[in-house]
């Protein structure tokens, strides 16, 4: 199993992470889908190694992207499992 790197940072102040070519999410930011904040994420298409963002798996092949939001590389859905305190590891 390949060690996956974190996907590229994106969004205001680089506080988000890319989840797909047009999806940028962060705990404090929520998710940007198809907006200017997510443009940088298209660069992932040119990088040879796979990446993964988010902590906890959710939905169909997605990962928790922000509070109450689950994203895969194509779309995001609301997901109660991804809310703060719903088994997410706490960051100090």
Curated annotation (Swiss-Prot):
GO MF annotation list: neurohypophyseal hormone activity; neuropeptide hormone activity; V1A vasopressin receptor binding
SMART domains for the chain: NH
Keyword terms, alphabetized: Disulfide bond, Secreted
Cysteine disulfide partners in this protein: 7-51, 10-24, 18-41, 25-31, 58-70, 64-82, 71-76
Pfam families (alphabetical): Hormone_5
Location (main, coarse): secreted
Gene3D superfamilies (alphabetical): Neurohypophysial hormone domain
Gene Ontology, cellular component aspect: extracellular space; secretory granule
Domain of life assignment: Eukaryota
Functional note: Neurophysin 2 specifically binds the midbrain peptide hormone vasopressin.
Family designation: Belongs to the vasopressin/oxytocin family.
Name the record gives this protein: Neurophysin 2
Gene that specifies this protein: AVP
